[in-house]
């Protein structure tokens, strides 16, 4: 029997607010255990949560970016469960009135196939702390993450392959990243994904029994976990067995999913309205204010780059892969620089440098101003492309003005024939055999002479001018 795969994803996105959702403690990633905490995070008797308005702002932006309806009147709920990293023994979340509902996002697969994935809901909640199990036999609780604001985005079960799930995550990350409400870095835990997967015979409308898969720290691991889980369930069903509703953990070393626990239902959490957080009324004016603050989406930027700036689809996609690079590009072309040249540098030397140094664009000295200044120096013949690579390294490491560095370092390209001719004659004198070979019909000998000329000028000779002069002198020698 053949089965159809049914996949739904629950994605937790950590919001980039300076303070926590109900506490004034910092949300900064890292730091010593329990250093970014407050009495509210510790859940001391008598303390009350205070809502961070910026979290609701971010929730509205996310809902707008995902084409969602917004609950104009909403409240928070208590989700009750006991665990050491949850000192209150309940989590403040949203149950029946999430901030956003009935959304959608378009995905595109590698083969160009497009599909629309519906989004059931997006609700705001607080994160839990973190347990660490030491080798000394003790378990330790770090509450730095306790109370960090999250938005959980729950898709409908519209995905039918692991590839579609991967494409959905890619599109979702891009949509959220461009709102500016989160950096969506899976490696730092600011984007986490749980997958619900089930199988059903083709033609059957009812869903099969689902399993939830956790502990996937990359998009590729989500795909691997789904591939394994689909195969595991299919094997059980074909053998006449039954699938249990359970939670499983993905082991990235073995590529397998492992049973964690039998899955709880919503009733197990005994949701009820949170009495210490008031109901919030979201006005149309508030929504429109958030809409006006949203930057141009990645999709809109790609269309602008292709239709207005003449870039290729490939270039447009590379530039919009991260908002930081896209913002940098947009600033750079304001300096009246050829968009294609800026694009080439960002995709070439800049990307290579960032990869090798394991840094992000804002962490180096390169700016839209000094990059475009350097490109102009290439275009007007002041420096060669080869010298520009040296200039770029200097700018990346130390910042500053490209023009000032070129002058200070003596890297200005030599284009004056009166300066080049004596050097050319000196090269001929030192390489008489190569000159004789060229005059004897060996055209490649001239290339060796060009190389010697560039060496003699330490790469500062204008290649076009130098080569033209050298050939003229060879023919007249």
From Swiss-Prot:
Per the UniProt entry, the signal peptide is none
Q: Which GO terms describe its molecular function?
A: asparaginyl-tRNA synthase (glutamine-hydrolyzing) activity; ATP binding; glutaminyl-tRNA synthase (glutamine-hydrolyzing) activity
Please tell me whether the keyword Nucleotide-binding is annotated for this protein: yes
Its assembly, as annotated, is: Heterotrimer of A, B and C subunits.
Catalytic reaction list: L-glutamyl-tRNA(Gln) + L-glutamine + ATP + H2O = L-glutaminyl-tRNA(Gln) + L-glutamate + ADP + phosphate + H(+); L-aspartyl-tRNA(Asn) + L-glutamine + ATP + H2O = L-asparaginyl-tRNA(Asn) + L-glutamate + ADP + phosphate + 2 H(+)
The GO biological-process annotations, alphabetized, read as: glutaminyl-tRNAGln biosynthesis via transamidation; translation
| Database matches in Gene3D superfamilies | 1.10.10.410, GatB domain, N-terminal subdomain
Please tell me which top-level EC class this enzyme sits in: ligase
Query: Which InterPro entries does the entry mention?
Result: Asn/Gln-tRNA_amidoTrfase_suB/E, Asn/Gln-tRNA_Trfase_suB/E_cat, Asn/Gln_amidotransferase, Asn/Gln_tRNA_amidoTrase-B-like, GatB, GatB_C_1, GatB_Yqey_C_2, Gln-tRNA_amidoTrfase_suB_CS
Keywords on record: ATP-binding, Ligase, Nucleotide-binding, Protein biosynthesis
Organism of derivation: Lactococcus lactis subsp. cremoris (strain MG1363)
Q: What lineage is on file?
A: Bacteria, Bacillati, Bacillota, Bacilli, Lactobacillales
Q: Which family does it belong to?
A: Belongs to the GatB/GatE family. GatB subfamily.
Q: Which Pfam families match?
A: GatB_N, GatB_Yqey
Q: What is this protein called?
A: Aspartyl/glutamyl-tRNA(Asn/Gln) amidotransferase subunit B
Q: Does the keyword Iron apply?
A: no
Question: What is the recorded function of this protein according to its Swiss-Prot or TrEMBL entry?
Answer: Allows the formation of correctly charged Asn-tRNA(Asn) or Gln-tRNA(Gln) through the transamidation of misacylated Asp-tRNA(Asn) or Glu-tRNA(Gln) in organisms which lack either or both of asparaginyl-tRNA or glutaminyl-tRNA synthetases. The reaction takes place in the presence of glutamine and ATP through an activated phospho-Asp-tRNA(Asn) or phospho-Glu-tRNA(Gln).
What Enzyme Commission number(s) apply to this enzyme? 6.3.5.-
